[in-house]
Amino acid sequence: MSTTTASTRKPMPSALTFDRHAKCSTTKARASTLHLPHGSVPLPIFMPVATQASLKGLTYDQLRETGCMLCLNNTYHLGLKPGQAVLDAVGGAHKLQGWDRNLLTDSGGFQMVSLLKLATVTEEGVRFLSPHDGSPMLLTPEHSISLQNSIGSDIIMQLDDVIATTSPDHARIKEAMDRSVRWLDRCIEEHKYPERQNLFCIIQGGLDLELRKQCCEEMVARDTPGVAIGGLSGGEAKEEFCKVVHTCTEILPEHKPRYVMGVGYPEDIVVAVALGADMFDCVWPTRTAVRLNKPCGSDPRTDINQRFGDAIVSSGTLKLSHKSFSDDFRPVEEGCTCICCRPTDQGGLGLTRAYMHHITAKETVGAHLLTIHNVHYMLNMMGKIRQAIIDDQYSAFLRKFFSDIYEGDKSKFPEWAVGALRGVGVDLLADS
């Protein structure tokens, strides 16, 4: 654990303000506004992922039209290409990509460990071989922060020691948690622009709730502008995922934003909001819109090698490549206000499921249009969640949400969601 003590630790400047507007009277859900240097962000929020400063299937003008106020870039990829020198020369990632709203960047640690087989983690940092030329490289907490300072993102993440929650090595999980705390201290020391970039800490500890509590206490003591819960969405059981989120939000301060990293499936989000989380990100809504002509047989939400022409709708997902949609002349989602679904007399394209079926498998425009719909759907869903919290109707929202997906058949409601929501006062199985 770090040797920095509370008495010697200086207060960290903040480039954000966090206004709380409403809290659900039953669950831990909250409606807030996060004021950042490039605009105000309504919470809870889903953040689309523009990995390499480009969102798959959308221009930034189209992303603006969805109402998005905060999206992600990837520090690891931008550090490799275009590289730090180019980022410094152009004046940061906002100017590089022509995006005048907020950016959040991860630290690069997750990519080091998850994408590179030859990565080695030591106290110094993460050693790996460049995927471009095979040369040895080292990512330290200091270098990660330096890269993010050059990127100029509104929210930057500490470099943490990432290990899969499914790892059986408890000693390694504890080591990663302790090291993440020490690395946070190094990130804080290196951070040059706290008056315009907000450094978030990342809670680690695997599925061990005592380690999570310990990490929360250590991270909270360092008083970063916001807090992330990391190391989840890595194959753990949903019941365990919910326990970790619930445990952490019980400890984390009410007056700071809470970000659960890597979460993007609608069912996961609505439950995590009830457990007290505010911010979410995932590549799934854009990835699932893209169809490659490969054999099917795997789950597009978990197999990164398969991408499908799927539309996210209130009843789950529509696999528009299926022949059953070839003569379905309804919009992708009834009542959706995205430009694809909106009727022509309301300024939309008025596209049908039949047309999307026709172009999804062969035309790149199909992936483009589905991505517009999926991102719009996710952001619109977050708006409905927020309004339900403000109206103190979030419990009713949850019941309708799961009823819509499972066509009113409560026997099909996922047990993990039923159990997690019962723990915060919502019984999905009770008679309405």
Task: Give residue ranges: language-model regions.
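Structural signal for hydrophobic packing residues in well-ordered secondary-structure cores
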Residues: 152, 184, 188-191, 223, ...
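Non-catalytic, usually N-terminal nucleic-acid engagement modules in DNA/RNA processing proteins
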Residues: 1-193, 318, 323
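C-terminal extensions of enzymes
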Residues: 2-35, 41-50, 56-57, 160-167, ...
